[in-house]
Each structure stands twice: as C-alpha cells, then as structure tokens.
Amino acid sequence: MFYEIMHRESCVAQLSTTGECRVCLEDFMPYDLVLVESDDFDERINNVTNFYYWCASRMLTLDRTYAKEILNSIGASQSVTDRERAQIALSYHCLSLLDVFWVKEENEKIRFEDINLFAHSLSNALVDIALRGHQMTVTNAHLLANDLSTGGLYPKAWVRKEDGFYLYKDGGREAVEREVLASKICRCFDCHQVLYEQGMFENEPVSISKIMTSQRYSLVTYAAYDVYCTNHDGNTLDKILELDAPSYYMMNILDYLVGNTDRHWENWGLLVDNETNQPIRLHDLMDFNRSFQQYDTPEGANCLTVGKRHLSQKDAAVEAVRNIGLNQVRQVEHTVFSEHPAWKATFEERLRVLRNAM
C-alpha cells in the first residue's frame, strides 16, 4: 500500500509500507519528516519508522492527562506503540489544526477542501473528552478528527466559535491564574504573543486563547525545525536568530520577567506561510501556565532556549536587553498582583535588573 503525504491539495511525497519512497515536492515536506529515496534496505526501514513516528506525533502525547480515556474510546491499547498510534491518526488522515499537512491512501478520492478542520465543524463531545476525561461512545469516535497534538501535561481542547477556534486549557485554578496573570504582564511589552483570558468550563476555570494558525499560516515547533536543520547541515539557533532575532530575545526577556520555567522545544518555534512552506518569523509567544516558578531570586531557572550554552534566565534576559532593549510599551498595573504581593516584589526586582543592564 502507498500513502500520499499531502500539503493542502498537493502530494509532497509517496511512501509504501515497505519504505519505498518518492519525494514529489521537497520544499513542501513537513519539517520534521525525513524520507530518503533509496533501494537500501536499512534506509527504507528508516523511512517507515520516520513516517509512523511523524503520524504518531500528530495524535496525542501519552503523558497527557486523560489519554487513557481517549484511547479507550477508540478501542486502542493503553500502551500503544508509534505504529499503533500512527494507525489511529491515519484513520483521521493525520489532520491537525496546527498545519495543513494530511495523509491519504493512494487513489483515495478525498480533498483537503472537504475535510480540513479549519472549515469543518467539531463536536462538543470532543471538548468533554479532552478536558474532563468523559467516556466517549463508539458512535462518536469519528469526532476525534481534531487537533489532539497540542502536547503538554495539561488537558486542552479546541473549541469552535463563530469567529474561529479557541484553545481551552485546564490544569487547575492555580495553573490558569498563572497563565492569565503572565499574559497581562506580557501585554505591556512589544511582542507577538497569544492573549490568554480566564473563562469557565463545567464550573471549572480554564484559560482561553484564540488559534494562531489558519489555512494560510502554520506552526512549526523548534523541535521540528531542529530536525530539518540537522538534516540540512544548519545550526538551528543561528537560523532562528537570522530569521527573527527580536522575537527570540523578547521571549527570553518575558520568560525571565514572569518566571516561566517551561519554555521547552515544543512550545516555541516558527510561523510558516503555507503558500511557500517557508518561515516568516517566530510564532506568537504562548504557554505561560508554569509561570512564577523559581521566582524567589533574581537569577531564575536555567534558560532552556540558548542551545548548548549554560545561562540562567537572568543572564539570557540581560543578553537580550543589550541586543534589542526592553521594549516596554506601558506600565504594568500594580493591581494585577493583588492576590500575589510576593510575586509583585520579585517582578519589580527583575524589571530593575533589566533596566540597569541597558
């Protein structure tokens, strides 16, 4: 059997279940999928392994809360392999709300226009499953054709409203409060960023943010871009600085100011133009539910975005300020810290550190 890896309505590669491969549009390949046209047995095995891993990554992360309930609902194993997870994702054509890639079988008569998730509605049954761990009936199993690949440890789901999709994130009141407070602070600085608001779902607090992707723009994680750069003899961080140094430095500044210790390589990356499959800048800064951690000293935690260098968050932020300035556009209102006076003192101390470094 041959699978066709699609970018919107264009076939970018064909791959058989034995690893035989033909790359049709190399410039439009997924950044984190490596396929090699070869008769070599080992390279063909690698093709199949890479393909199933890529498909599985478009499903859900197994450490995600309520993953068991989601897998139970579609009759999957509790401890699934990449291949099993890939088969689950393939049953929904590997669709995602993060990009416009999908997969179909050779000669399958189906179009992206007819199934893409940006234009076709989702069921509220999905929201229940993803956020609350409700058991889903077999008859609703097909409604899982949504984005379950947002990753992370916190329950989350995309919800369609009249003006587009919104991400609802659970994780408990404290995580929601941290994310919303961090968002209020970040808005006082000039930076492309996701705006988080507090809301309720089934009488529980959630943070709510609008989707940043569309049929025109996709999201590529740093992890995916690193795969691409590694296989094209490029230094990932150098390429990012060449593309959009201001956004990179603002990320390090804001993560330091709000004490975000969870800037791992899956929650920052590139915004890609789907017309060309080329990056245009870093995508909007997101994910602040682990803010105000290790927030009792000016140093902060180790910075996770500086490659192989060993820098504290303070050192990375000072370096950033010396490159681009602070870019504060308005004062942070003291009232946002009304319930956390200790955080207010630390924030002001860290802000002074950066102002003095300019």
Predicted regions, residues:
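Glycine-rich phosphate-binding P-loop
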Residues: T261
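Conserved protein-kinase catalytic-loop segment immediately C-terminal to the catalytic Asp
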Residues: H264, G269-V272
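Phosphate/dinucleotide-binding and metal-coordinating scaffold of catalytic cores
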Residues: M1-I253, L257-V258, L271-M358
